[in-house]
Amino acid sequence: MRQAATERLGIGYKNLRKAAPNIIYASATGYRRNSPKDGRPAYDDVIQGESGLVDLIDKTNGEARFVPMPISDKFCGHTLASAIGMALFSREKTGKGQEIHVPMLETMLAFNLTTHLWEGTKGPTNDLGYPRALSPYRIPYKTKDGMVCVLAHTDEQWHRLLRAIGRSDLIEDARFTKLSERAQNIATLQSYLAEELAKFTTEEAFRKLDEADLPNGPVAKLDELMIDPYLQETNFFQKIDDPHENIVFTTAPPVDFSGTPATVRSAAPALGQHSEEILLSAGISKNIVNKIINKGR
């Protein structure tokens, strides 16, 4: 919600801080406060475009497209949650609350340019974009009957990978001996991998890569994930009761806590389901809450 709206509704930081001086007040909008774009509306697709993410996809496949998920919304939400955790820790130490604001554009710029600032670390330049990540060969490798994903980073891993695919001769090739040389010739190196892996079946490729202790895996189809044996073994998909849908499937929390295990406690709430609970927890009297609810009916 944009700042003008929260102020108009009387739920801005300054107002709420009067009632709860140590409040941690978190918000996210499209752009940084007090900037030329402050107050402009923004959604995920807009931020994908402005942050250079669409251009990155264009650079890899020659077509400007959005990432097929609301990645800006998701990452900004994670950033906001992380910031809230840090503010809570600070309050435990100092007793003081604070206001947190996460601008979507700046958050996604930081997310993208951590990888792709590249030569821009030396100053303004047209040479942005990490070559290895933008290589046309940075794709799953085709086998005789499918595809595999494999990645090597260290010199030793590259040596093991080249031996595994039968190209030990490339280990001493001056273009690939060190990280800096590989970075400059990554497309050529990846083209060799593609050529050799295409000679194996998928199972043969997995076996060779596993024997070399290299990170590798399949290309999973989205509609096969819910019956994937590994995910079934780890109970990743969970059934929960939903008063509106009877039973719904959802994903389990991906983080494991040894002392405070995470659980899915309930389905997503219906519209207004928790309004009374939230208002009461904010310190608003039961009488006023009832008036608010009755007025809204």
Task: Label each residue range with its predicted role.
Residues E211-R265:
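A glycine-rich dinucleotide-binding beta-alpha-beta segment and adjacent secondary-structure elements
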Residues A4, G30-R32, D223-E224, I293:
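Conserved beta-strand edge residues that scaffold enzyme active sites
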Residues E172-R182, V219-I227, I288-R297:
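Short linear loop/turn motifs
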Residues A5-V148, A152-H153:
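Active-site-adjacent "lid/gating" segments in soluble enzymes
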Residues P136-A212, N216:
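Aromatic-enriched alpha-helical interface/lid elements that frame and gate functional surfaces
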